[in-house]
Amino acid sequence: MRERIITFVSLLLVALLSFPSVSYCDDQTILYESFDEPFDGRWVVSEKAEYQGVWKHEKSEGHDDYGLLVSEKAKKYGIVKELDVDEPLNLNEGTVVLQYEARFQEGLECGGAYLKYLRPQEAGWVPQGFDNDSPYSIMFGPDKCGATNKVHFILKHKNPKSGEFVEHHLKFPPSVPFDMLSHVYTAVLKSDNEVRILVDGEEKKKGNLLSAEDFEPPLIPSKTIPDPEDKKPEDWDERAKIPDPNAVKPDDWDEDAPMEIEDEEAEKPEGWLDDEPVEVEDPEASKPEDWDDEEDGEWEAPKVSNTKCEAAPGCGEWKRPMKRNPAYKGKWSSPLIDNPAYKGIWKPRDIPNPDYFELERPNLEPIAAIGIEIWTMQDGILFDNILISKDEKVAETYRQSTWKPKFDVEKEKQKAEDEAAGEADGLKSYQKKVFDLLYKVADISFLSAYKSKIMELIEKAETQPNLTIGVLISIVIVFLSLFFKLIFGGAKAKVEKKKPETAAETSTSEAKTEEKAEAVAAPRKRQTRRES
């Protein structure tokens, strides 16, 4: 009984202690979408004709965790969720954290996975009409296609003078992770105009909303601009260097000397076949049966390399090679000297910018909804755990509890796959080294009688790599057989010479000649196979 009371009190204390924390998180969380349940009813798919992509409620590969899935390739997608709040989220007060997960399960070659944080729309707007023209306050997230590879952070800020909304892009944003793992993207906006971009909880970029070094175009225009009415004077000389007017071409400067001349010291290689053409007609070619001389013209056999040239240093007319002409100097030109009339590169004078204004704090548009409006060539993009919070600690808590466990599992799986692939590559590399060694062994001169057999074994092993060990054993046996033959059988073979066996010796010689021919042909065959 006493133990039950202690247990009950402990549970009560835990509940009481955790209650303020839960309330604190709820107070700081404007939106959290886990996609644990089907998104129908909470998210509205655009009904515009161009958005044909089908959104699905699917599990992330290898997990029981659900997300919002891009299910088809080469489609436009549009979906939106309005914030369930009384008033749109004010971005000009305190800290605001935007965070979500994205996973490219099929990789990403050309497509986006960014979110648009929509400002309040015009009267009469409905979520079903969401499209690319629906105005947003912030666009944030990965985008990759061609030369584009960045995690966008774009502000649409209203110019206080013109009243027009202008896109301001964060300069030098982080790159998109190139793997197929789950990644979490976080943007933190602070009240001191600081903006931070995190990928997987690690800060990748920090900037200031009002800094011209961090945003293009800058939110605050420059105080001065080039005078559009100013024009360069006609006598303004921008040439820093000019040809020396007093320079004279040297008398020994030959402008007509060629860059290359024949090498008079070169001699025609011995054995050069002057009367043999480099190419000859293919003797095995025959005129096609359907060839019509009147329509197709006179048939000519295709050309092939002249086999006689393979053993010779060359065929056809021999010509001396060319070499660089030591007397070559090229066209003469006057050396350059400093221009005494040089005034520098002209630029218009600066005048006060009529569009200049000052800001202590950007007037960011509030957020009323979240939209995903993308055109992607890949399917398998999964969105999950979309969060808008006023506290960085809340965002960190969600990263650790929702993203980190999945990422760790995926990372371990990827590591195991990479190791397996590495072992396979290592085995292939080992086999290649073995075969290279075996080919060198086959070329040893005193093994010429066995070369055809060794080559046959090697070629068989190359087509069936699992036989590599067996081939090694076979070649070792050949070595041992030859070794014992040389030690125990070599002397007797030299002493005995019988005339009746001359025919047999001739036959053996012919056999060896054939084997040598095969041995010569075998490396050539091997080279061709390797080159192909």
UniProtKB/Swiss-Prot annotation:
Q: Where is the signal peptide?
A: 1-25
The ranges of the sequence repeats are 227-238, 244-255, 263-274, 282-293, 297-307, 316-326, 330-340, 344-354
- Where do Acidic residues bias regions lie? 252-283, 290-299
The ranges of region (Disordered) come to 208-302, 493-532
Query: Could you tell me what this protein is called?
Result: Calnexin homolog 2
UniProt record similarity statement: Belongs to the calreticulin family.
Q: Which UniProt keywords apply?
A: Calcium, Chaperone, Disulfide bond, Endoplasmic reticulum, Glycoprotein, Lectin, Membrane, Metal-binding, Repeat, Signal, Transmembrane, Transmembrane helix
Q: What is the annotated localization of this protein? A: Endoplasmic reticulum membrane
Q: Which residues lie on this side of the membrane: Lumenal?
A: 26-468
Q: Output the superkingdom of the source species.
A: Eukaryota
Example GO molecular function = calcium ion binding
Write out the residues that bind an alpha-D-glucoside: Y114, K116, Y136, D143, E373
Question: Which stretches of sequence are listed as region 4 X approximate repeats?
Answer: 227-293, 297-354
Which source organism does the UniProt entry give?
Arabidopsis thaliana (Mouse-ear cress)
Query: Which portions of the sequence form the region P domain (Extended arm)?
Result: 225-358
Q: Which Pfam families match?
A: Calreticulin (PF00262)
Specify residue ranges for compositional bias: Basic residues: 523-532
Q: Name one GO cellular component term.
A: endoplasmic reticulum membrane
- Where does the record say carbohydrate is attached? N466
